[in-house]
From Swiss-Prot:
Annotated HTH gntR-type domain residues: 16-84
Name of the featured protein: HTH-type transcriptional regulator TauR
Presence of keyword Ribosomal protein: no
Cofactor needs: pyridoxal 5'-phosphate
Lineage: Bacteria, Pseudomonadati, Pseudomonadota, Alphaproteobacteria, Rhodobacterales
Family that this chain belongs to: In the C-terminal section; belongs to the class-I pyridoxal-phosphate-dependent aminotransferase family.
Biological role: Transcriptional activator, which is essential for taurine-dependent expression of the tpa-tauR-xsc operon. Acts by binding to direct repeats in the promoter region.
Regulation: induction: Induced by taurine. Positively autoregulated.
Record-linked PANTHER family: HTH-TYPE TRANSCRIPTIONAL REGULATORY PROTEIN GABR
One GO term (biological process): biosynthetic process
Amino acid sequence: MAIPVESFFLAPGGQGSLQHRLRQMVTEGILSGRFRPGDRMPSTRALAAHLGVARITVTLAYADLVASDYLLARGRSGTFVSAAAPDARKARPLPRDGARTDWARLLHPRAQGLPRPDRPRDWSLYRYPFIYGQADPELFDHQNWRACALQALGRREFHRLSADCYDEDDPLLVEYILRHILPRRGIAAVPSEVLITMGAQNGLWLAAQVLLGPGERAAMENPGYPGTRAVLGTTGAEVLSVDVDDRGLVPAQLPARLKLVVTTASHHCPTNATLPVERRLALLAAAEAGDFLILEDDYEFEMSFLQSAAPSLKSLDAGGRVVHVGSFSKSLFPGLRLGYLVAPAPFVAAVRALRATVLRHPPGQLQRTLALFLSLGHYDALVARMKAAYRLRREVMTKAIEDNGLQIAGQGGFGGSSFWMQAPGAVDTEDLALRLRAEGVLIEPGRVFFDPARERRNFYRLAYSSIGPAAIPEGIARIARALR
């Protein structure tokens, strides 16, 4: 790749001759890894004109660097970074001015210590990846997605993509959500009550930012989705944990003086429990009596292959106190980063203004591609294929778990893509996960799902969204052997 001439500049007041400073600039670029073997250097004429120096200065500097094996001259083809140049990975790190900056003091405490997923970046190379939230590329409809993406880039659609829509969403995508997605959750809404988000995590963040601040109180499930705890923590509000049982959140245990309750009512994360109707009604009644709002993270309802998914909490919301957050990441692919938020129009207007301040709107090309994929029926066909695959994988995993004597702590009744598991009390599943990586097995330790003040270390999650049925039995057997 060609190195842009703009990559080079001479700092005012530099020490040494122009030729020396130019050599130093190139060697620092190579040693830092910015310039890589095979990259083509700017021509001597172009670099001299850019820096405002004589061409002979650049020519002599290049000649010295060729003699030192930093650069390689290839005649009329140009000058390139040499493969014999020192390896940037082995070179001593160059001193940076930022090292003198006290970032621990300058960064706000809320920006420090935010959780990061504890999984290797190369997870797909492991033979037994029982990790949640990753897609199996073998199931995805690449051909039709590509066709929809090309159509979205066509002349007929491009006029919208090329405009700055400021805070507006793709009307075709909003219409499909209103007419096809929300009715499946028992929700009736109008366009002013829907906002497109950059995935469920972004929806949770937007909602929390417009609702909470220092001195206010929010409650979430324990165990619960780690991303919720991180989002609530960024607001400065007091975050309280409410223990769940085998049926989910217990409304009677909610603390007083709340501003917000976050729940995964239809499919609790991570236990997979579904909140019964009587508890849903009790939660809504508590919201009315206590004057708080409910943030419903309604994930993975599409994967209901054992029985129909329970209606959303929002479908029972007569008082307008539920903010409903949904996502397409689990049913399409996590890298899509598109979802939606449904709430009363005044709330959506406030969130839309915040979103516009941060990122205007999600990419128009992605929105239109998804809208076409949905409206042409490809999405429903994909979901049907995934449900069939997940049903088979769940059956295989259930048998493997039983055959190996592992203990299921939560599996849900409608489907999903994971099991919540419990190891013997003395087992630390973070240590277990490290040992299993050497065996080619990836699991999710359960500690991160719990309130840090009441953490449990002997739980873990096993997902089957990214592992084929043929690999499941051996992967489960390796987990069982590691637990013995």
